[in-house]
């Protein structure tokens, strides 16, 4: 921001100090003018000389001029002060506006962060639930696979036992057939021998 003409970088504090100092000077000048007027009145009453009167009158004019100059300077400084105060007010409002905008943006960011954090926590919880469900399903699947393996072993053992049983049955059947054949041959042989004896006995008679 550009510095106004006659305005120092000291800020509004230095302007207020200069303003107070000028006010003190004006009060001193007014007091001096009052004293000079009293002196002129006293001199008039005491019939002062014309030279002294002109000298006092000259000083009074000079003091009035200085007083007017000081008042003009004071008015100028007051104008600078009001300008500075106006700038301070504008800057304060702008700063407050920027502060409110920043706080609003910060609040929005915090809200988004909390929402994202909440979503993240929900996703983590969901993933953990899915992972836990998968582990349970894997455990169930492993249990089923073990049951299937056990059943396969039982079936395989039963098949083997059945095959062994069939083999034993065939062997037994073969043995029974063989024994039947042997017995049949023995019966036939015995029958033939009995018939032969019977015929021989008939001949002898």
UniProtKB/Swiss-Prot annotation:
GO terms for molecular function: DNA binding; identical protein binding. Testis-specific (at protein level). Residues 17-167 form a coiled coil. One of its GO terms (biological process) is spermatogenesis. One of its GO terms (cellular component) is nucleoplasm. Residues 186-205 have a biased composition (Basic residues). It holds the Pfam family SPATA24. Residues 138-185 are annotated as: Required for interaction with CBX5 and TBPL1. Keywords: Coiled coil, Cytoplasm, Developmental protein, Differentiation, DNA-binding, Nucleus, Spermatogenesis, Transcription, Transcription regulation. It is found in: Cytoplasm; Nucleus, Nucleolus; Nucleus, Nucleoplasm. Residues 185-205 are annotated as: Disordered. Binds DNA with high affinity but does not bind to TATA boxes. Synergises with GMNN and TBP in activation of TATA box-containing promoters and with GMNN and TBPL1 in activation of the NF1 TATA-less promoter. May play a role in cytoplasm movement and removal during spermiogenesis. Belongs to the SPATA24 family. PANTHER family: SPERMATOGENESIS-ASSOCIATED PROTEIN 24 (PTHR35155:SF1). Homodimer. Interacts with CBX3, CBX5, GMNN, GTF2B, TBPL1 and the polycomb proteins PHCF2, RNF2 and SCMH1 but not with CBX1 or PCGF2. This is Spermatogenesis-associated protein 24.
């Amino acid at each position: 921001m550009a510095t106004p003409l006659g305005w120092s970088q000291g800020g509004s504090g230095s302007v207020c100090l200069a303003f107070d100092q000028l006010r003190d000077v004006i009060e001193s000048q007014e007091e001096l003018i009052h004293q000079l007027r009293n002196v002129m009145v006293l001199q008039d009453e005491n019939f002062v000389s014309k030279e002294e009167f002109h000298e006092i009158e000259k000083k009074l004019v000079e003091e009035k001029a200085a007083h007017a100059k000081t008042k003009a300077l004071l008015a100028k400084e007051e104008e600078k002060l009001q300008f500075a105060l106006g700038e301070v007010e504008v800057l304060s409002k702008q700063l407050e506006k920027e502060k409110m905008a920043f706080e609003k943006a910060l609040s929005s960011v915090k809200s988004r962060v909390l929402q994202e954090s909440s979503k993240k926590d929900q996703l983590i919880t969901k993933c953990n639930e899915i992972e836990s469900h998968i582990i349970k399903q894997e455990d169930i699947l492993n249990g089923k696979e073990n049951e299937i393996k056990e059943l396969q072993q039982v079936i395989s053992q039963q098949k083997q036992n059945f095959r062994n049983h069939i083999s034993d049955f065939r062997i037994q059947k073969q043995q029974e057939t063989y024994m039947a054949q042997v017995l049949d041959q023995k019966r036939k042989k015995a029958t033939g021998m009995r018939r032969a004896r019977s015929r021989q006995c008939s001949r002898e008679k």
